[in-house]
Regions:
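Glycan-recognition and catalytic cores of secretory/periplasmic carbohydrate-active enzymes
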Residues: 1-171
Length: 171
């Protein structure tokens, strides 16, 4: 799916970074309505995500404001693979779990594992703000961000699937 498009449907930015954003909606459509076309379409989105985002580690441009690599693209890839793992079985399910793990490690690279030493006189420094566990935004918009949505829940689930207890500690 194009990242940006006009009202008439023509592409403004044909980058496929927004593709995983459609997956959860398609999976839920399949669950609610039982229509296998939704599941087939969801799988096609993750086929694209695997080949163009996860495999080359090019988590790029899933939002309208940043035309660069960003954690939002990684979290969208994590979420899309999680949703497909939840509705598949056997080897297919394991494949989506493996993709989810790979995307999760990349997404975690955007989260602070330390407390940034903010200078005195800066608001966050004066407040004694601790940045550990908070996300950074992107290389274009370098600031602390609250964007996590389902990520902690997915990490906890993934930790049990792959026997990685560290993932559960984010929850």
């Amino acid at each position: 799916f194009a990242r940006k498009f006009n009202d008439d449907g023509t592409d403004v930015d044909a980058s496929g970074g927004s593709t995983p954003s459609a997956t959860s909606t398609l999976v839920m459509g399949y669950r609610y309505f039982g229509n296998k076309n939704y599941l087939k379409s969801a799988k096609r989105t993750v086929d694209y995500v695997e080949k163009n985002i996860i495999a080359p580690a090019d988590y790029f441009s899933s939002t309208l404001d940043a035309n660069c690599e960003d954690k939002e693209a990684a979290i969208a890839a994590v979420t899309s693979t999680y949703y497909l793992a939840m509705v598949t079985k056997g080897k297919e399910r394991q494949h989506y779990i493996d993709l989810c793990r790979k995307a999760t490690y990349f997404a975690l690279s955007w989260y602070y594992l330390w407390d940034v030493p903010f200078a005195e006189g800066q608001m966050l420094g004066d407040l004694g703000f601790r940045s550990r566990g908070w996300g950074n935004v992107s290389v274009e918009n370098n600031h602390i961000d609250v964007f996590v949505f389902e990520f902690p829940h997915i990490m906890k689930w993934l930790g049990t699937q792959i026997n990685e207890p560290r993932f559960g500690s984010m929850y």
